Design a protein with these regions (language model features):
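Charged, compositionally biased N-terminal leader segments and the immediate start
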Residues: 1-34
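Interdomain "pre-motor" coupling segment immediately N-terminal to P-loop NTPase/helicase cores
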Residues: 23-77
């Protein structure tokens, strides 16, 4: 009785390959430039059409998978879709013209945005909604409360991997820092936060949400010079959205 020869790795695929064989091969093929480059020489028009359709669907599938992953990777504390955001409590600068934050044009230009106003006026809600829009448009986002990146950067510094942590933050196209000024930050933590902000200057957008006017940012950074430098960068390459009105939580409180 003759024995079946074992299938050799890298052997020629039969002309009448089964769908299972095709899928088995495709699973192990992160394609290089050299292989697809030879396809027009070896394939018939029908085969090229099939491959184009296959690759188009694969690209669409990967893009959709990435779109679903991005919100989880961003670290949003909760979901705040844009449709639930009115923006009615924020006043926009007069020079904005018809541009609104949801267009994300400021992200395309690597500009910064400061959301300033009293507690409970919707700053965090708007910041998350903008971040979720960015994720839908395939822009990587990182969301932090102000104390969180300080702790991460300090631990990274202690572990001699500060550069790696800064690069990790730097992979985002939009960084959101919430509650800036809610809790005091010591001078070393402020320097680390400033370094992360300096690395982002004109290379990615940063949204900062704070209830402190710029004149009190020295309280955040613990150093007037660092505060002045941070404000200078924002004035040069950013905008301020002012929030006003009664706190949403107070307005809808059950304790009345």
């Amino acid at each position: 009785m003759s024995q079946q020869k074992p299938r050799q790795r890298g052997g020629r695929v039969p002309d009448k390959a089964t769908p299972e064989q095709v899928m088995g091969l495709a699973r192990n093929l992160p394609l290089t430039h050299s292989v697809p480059g030879k396809a027009p020489e070896d394939a018939t028009p029908g085969q090229l059409g099939f491959l184009a359709n296959l690759f188009e669907k694969e690209n669409a599938s990967r893009a959709e998978s990435k779109r679903r992953r991005l919100p989880g990777q961003a670290g949003f504390p909760q979901s705040r879709p844009w449709r639930d955001t009115t923006g009615g409590m924020a006043s926009f600068p007069a020079d904005r013209g018809s541009e609104q934050p949801e267009s994300l044009e400021f992200v395309d230009r690597d500009e910064d945005l400061v959301l300033y106003g009293d507690v409970g006026c919707g700053k965090t809600h708007l910041a998350i909604a903008i971040g979720m829009l960015a994720c839908q448009r395939m822009i990587p986002v990182r969301f932090f409360t102000a104390s969180s990146p300080v702790m991460r950067l300090r631990k990274a510094q202690d572990d001699n991997r500060l550069d790696a942590e800064l690069k990790s933050i730097g992979r985002a196209g939009l960084v959101i820092i919430d509650e800036l000024g809610h809790l005091p930050i010591d001078i070393d933590g402020a320097r680390l936060l400033f370094q992360a902000g300096a690395d982002s200057y004109e290379t990615r957008s940063v949204i900062s949400a704070s209830n402190l006017e710029s004149g009190r940012w020295g309280d955040v950074f613990g150093d007037g010079d660092m505060a002045a430098a941070a404000i200078d960068r924002i004035v040069h390459h950013g905008r301020i959205l002012r929030f006003h009105g009664e706190s949403y939580r107070n307005k809808h409180s059950l304790m009345k």
